[in-house]
């Protein structure tokens, strides 16, 4: 899994170095047609605690994923099982949405670039309010020959009640391999 993620990130970096922007490609007829081909709803699985959980990814002018299981994020904050269970009861999952800002086409793959997503929630555990802020970076790749979508959402910052949690070394990452059109 780590190898796939590393390759995915390297390809995205390579794409960024080539400097393709949606403003130029999407306005061209072929680029617009490819972008239209990508639009739609896809179904894939995010693995949490070795259990695949079904998720939907929607691509329009925005990128949206729902539901996004919160256990990996909340488990970093609430290390006591009872507290974690209470936190998960109040917010089981979320929908993330962000605008698509760029598109690049390289060797049969389309890379969609989006703004980072900021998720904020107030969760009460044991009668105490916890203000949580998580910043996530979505990375998306669409295979032009198979029409399969691969996404990786990496939590880049995690804060609860002004306390920062380590997500740089001990990463929180959501990975969906080969989501298919619904």
Which residues does each predicted region cover?
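Bacterial Sec-dependent N-terminal signal peptides
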Residues: 3-6, 12-43, 182
């Amino acid at each position: 899994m780590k190898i796939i993620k590393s390759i995915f990130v390297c390809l995205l970096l390579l794409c960024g170095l080539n400097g393709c922007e949606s403003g130029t490609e999407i306005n061209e007829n072929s680029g617009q047609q490819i972008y239209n081909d990508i639009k739609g709803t896809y179904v894939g699985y995010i693995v949490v605690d070795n259990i695949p959980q079904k998720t939907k990814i929607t691509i329009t002018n925005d990128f949206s994923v729902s539901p996004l299981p919160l256990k990996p994020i909340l488990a970093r904050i609430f290390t006591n099982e009872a507290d974690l269970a209470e936190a998960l009861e109040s917010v089981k999952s979320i929908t993330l949405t962000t605008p698509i800002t760029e598109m690049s086409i390289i060797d049969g793959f389309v890379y969609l670039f989006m703004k980072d997503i900021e998720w904020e929630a107030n969760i009460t555990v044991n009668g105490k309010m916890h203000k949580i802020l998580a910043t996530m970076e979505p990375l998306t790749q669409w295979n032009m020959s198979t029409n399969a979508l691969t996404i990786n959402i990496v939590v880049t910052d995690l804060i609860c009640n002004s306390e920062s949690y380590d997500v740089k070394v001990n990463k929180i990452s959501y990975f969906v391999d080969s989501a298919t059109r619904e």
